[in-house]
Design a protein with these regions (language model features):
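Conserved catalytic-core segment of nucleotide-activated headgroup transferases in glycan assembly
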Residues: 21-34, 159-208
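Serine/threonine-rich low-complexity intrinsically disordered regions
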Residues: 3, 46-49, 149, 195-196, ...
Length: 208
């Protein structure tokens, strides 16, 4: 790639329409702590999180010509989904199955901790250069059963967990982390919402 903005590029994304998970926090860390790294973030032009990326710089509009160019030029493709940063996840998933992949190293940041069997993430079905694990038992499980080379799964923790640490906060806290749920499904999730509200209310009462 001739253009300097695509050289030694780290391309980062989540689902392509958001910036609020491990992809965002990893990208923010790169921009704030390692400005010498040429990092860019893929996100839709009309995303509600667009301003967060514009504030950091390096936005690549999803589906644009620059997205395709960045995808094929990048040295590292970093994302919370498999086929990270692909302009079309389904298309590039099938192309990868035929051995046709972008040149960049593929880094799978994940969303959270894997606790169940997920055969579609096994090496026979998926290619990754780095499989980030957020817990030691998870790392050992993936290392021993998913079929990747020993260097691929790495226990390095999840980027968004770093944001939970606030050295200046001394009070005791109880952290509640429900499993992932699409934001649009919350209004109809009456039972889970009621259960979590009860737990939080009980916890607050117990700590007073």
């Amino acid at each position: 790639c001739c253009s300097a903005k695509y050289r030694e590029l780290w391309l980062v994304c989540e689902r392509g329409n958001d910036a609020r998970d491990n992809g965002y926090w990893f990208y923010r860390y790169l921009k704030e702590k390692h400005p010498e790294i040429n990092a860019r973030y893929v996100i839709e032009a009309d995303s509600a999180d667009r301003a967060k990326i514009e504030a950091l710089g390096g936005m690549v509009p999803r589906g644009s010509f620059s997205h395709y160019l960045a995808y094929y030029c990048a040295d590292f493709l970093v994302g919370t989904h498999v086929q990270p940063c692909a302009p079309d996840l389904i298309l590039f998933y099938h192309l990868a199955g035929k051995g046709i992949r972008a040149r960049g190293k593929q880094v799978f940041l994940q969303h959270g901790i894997i606790k169940d069997e997920m055969e579609w993430l096994h090496r026979k079905n998926m290619y990754m250069d780095l499989f980030v694990c957020g817990a030691k038992p998870e790392y050992e499980y993936i290392r021993d059963t998913f079929g990747y080379s020993e260097h691929v799964p790495q226990y390095v923790g999840l980027a968004r967990f770093d944001n939970l640490i606030r050295a200046e906060r001394k009070e005791k806290m109880i952290l509640v982390m429900p499993t992932w749920r699409g934001s649009k499904s919350w209004p109809t999730a009456a039972r889970p919402l009621c259960c979590w509200s009860t737990i939080c209310a009980s916890s607050m009462t117990a700590t007073r």
